[in-house]
């Protein structure tokens, strides 16, 4: 659906931003083995994305959740440290602003701070719940969406538009331009 396409688009921008312009010419063959971080609650689009981008599903490091099924940031930090020690490049953390099965909202502010410290792309899958950020009663973590490098939204969930209405928001528009522009 539109949400899957929006999320994949955001991770393509992350791949280009982190691995550089050479990834377009050389593919992944000269790139370090990369890792993506997400919980088991993350929608299945992520497996599709890493497969389509040539990383393979083994590039996903699954982060534990807390009792509310939100990403455990202590475990996330440990996973990142362990992967760095093993020689992997932490490429992106994927948080959920409302999971499909439970509506759980990951601790966005804490994840953003960790990603900033670690210099890792921070993506939010907001297809299911990001639209709720406009509500005065929105949870504090939904009010922090602007801390992400990219956010995917899907207007057919809450905004009553037809399917294939995915949207990608990025902190720096040049990441999308650099990813998809071709010189003629």
Please state what every model-predicted region is.
Residues 2-3:
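Helix-enriched interaction subdomains in cytosolic or periplasmic regions
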Residues 6-179:
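Conserved PLP-enzyme active-site core in the AAT-like
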């Amino acid at each position: 659906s539109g949400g899957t396409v929006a999320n994949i688009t955001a991770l393509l921008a992350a791949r280009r931003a982190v691995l550089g312009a050479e990834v377009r010419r050389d593919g992944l063959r000269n790139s370090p083995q990369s890792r993506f971080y997400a919980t088991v609650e993350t929608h299945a689009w992520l497996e599709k994305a890493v497969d389509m981008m040539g990383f393979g599903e083994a590039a996903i490091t699954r982060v534990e959740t807390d009792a509310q099924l939100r990403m455990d940031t202590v475990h996330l930090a440990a996973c990142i440290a362990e992967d760095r020690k093993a020689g992997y490049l932490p490429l992106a953390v994927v948080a959920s602003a409302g999971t499909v099965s439970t509506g759980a909202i990951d601790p966005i502010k804490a994840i953003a701070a960790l990603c900033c410290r670690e210099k890792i792309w921070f993506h939010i899958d907001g297809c299911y719940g990001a639209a709720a950020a406009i509500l005065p009663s929105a949870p504090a973590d939904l009010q922090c969406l602007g801390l992400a490098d990219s956010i995917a939204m899907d207007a057919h969930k809450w905004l009553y538009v037809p399917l294939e209405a995915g949207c990608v928001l990025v902190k720096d528009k040049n990441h999308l331009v650099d990813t998809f522009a071709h010189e003629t």
